[in-house]
UniProtKB/Swiss-Prot annotation:
Protein name: Probable 4-deoxy-4-formamido-L-arabinose-phosphoundecaprenol deformylase ArnD
GO molecular function, one term: hydrolase activity, acting on carbon-nitrogen (but not peptide) bonds, in linear amides
Domain annotation NodB homology: ranges: 2-260
Broad class of enzyme this protein falls into: hydrolase
Keyword Lipid biosynthesis: yes
Family affiliation: Belongs to the polysaccharide deacetylase family. ArnD deformylase subfamily.
């Protein structure tokens, strides 16, 4: 039996309003629990359109057929008008998710974090995280114990900023296995549970065809030598490619693959490491990557 952490990122208003209820229904049908990370502030995702001037981002949008994948409402959100606030407008949906699944913070403003957090000072970052956590806790009526940085935009600054909130774990980077990042003080920080597997949009049209994706992914899962963690998006697997996700769950069960919330992957003792800026094939720009302590 292979155990895989299932992380669901919710980036947008439509992903929350339409994608999450569909995913909740699917997960209930297959008796699966996951970790769901919500963006709760304004939906300004359309402001990423300026990145089309960057060849790597443009190619990603073209090969993944982004207009069909996400829809024009997502691609234009927050461009010619202020972005709609996601959290309180979809509070019932978020509360329903929290009844059955592990719920954490993805971002206050997903676009702002992904586009600008790399240049923020620490206090700006702490204030932004606090605003998101406060809003999510108001909605679900209980403490939030985990978070996942939007777009995996994380480095030492993010690690230090999140220590102020005493979360159980964060999932801010890409890597191979859970670990504790070293703080500037030399002490181990809050556990990190990295994503180990590629997302749909990172590989479609580059490494694999859409119709072959599930078999390709299951092969990667079964060959994973670390602690497999897979991320889906409410805007993709909860909307245009929900049928593909359902097929993945069916095939995974046949292969002896089970999915679980990320917290079930934690253990009493974890290796030490760091979160450093790096690059991942198929994704434009830098993102946080696991580095084992002592390696370079």
């Amino acid at each position: 039996m292979t155990k895989v952490g299932l992380r669901i990122d919710v980036d947008t208003f439509r992903g929350t309003r339409e994608g999450v209820p569909r995913l909740l229904e699917t997960l209930s049908k297959y008796n699966i629990q996951a970790s769901i990370f919500f963006s709760v502030g304004p939906d300004n995702m359309g402001r990423h359109l300026w990145r089309l001037v960057k060849p790597q981002f443009l190619w990603k949008m073209l090969r993944s057929n982004a207009a069909s994948l996400y829809g024009w409402d997502i691609l234009l959100a927050g461009t010619a008008w202020p972005g709609k606030e996601i959290g309180h407008a979809n509070a019932d949906i978020i509360r329903e998710a929290a009844k059955h699944h592990e719920v954490g913070l993805h971002a206050w403003d997903h676009h702002a974090w992904q586009a600008h957090s790399g240049n923020w000072d620490r206090q700006t970052m702490v204030d932004d995280i606090a605003r998101g956590l406060r809003t999510l806790e108001e909605i679900i009526g209980q403490p939030v114990t985990c978070s996942a940085a939007a777009g995996w935009r994380a480095d030492q600054q993010v690690i230090e900023a999140k220590e102020a909130f005493h979360l159980r774990y964060n999932s801010d980077c890409r890597g191979a296995m859970p670990f504790r990042p070293l703080l500037e003080s030399g002490k181990p920080g809050t556990a990190q549970i990295p994503v180990t597997l590629p997302t749909w949009d990172e590989v479609i049209g580059r490494d694999v065809k859409a119709e072959d994706f599930n078999g390709w992914l299951l092969n990667r899962i079964l060959r994973d030598k670390g602690t497999p963690v897979y991320t889906i998006h409410a805007e993709v697997e909860g909307c245009a490619y929900q049928h593909n996700f359902v097929d993945l769950l069916k095939r995974a069960a046949q292969e002896g693959v089970t999915f679980c919330p990320l917290s079930e992957l934690l253990s009493e003792t974890l290796p030490l490491g760091q979160v450093v800026r790096g690059n991942i094939a198929g994704r434009e720009g830098w993102l946080g990557c696991q580095q084992i302590a002592g390696s370079r």
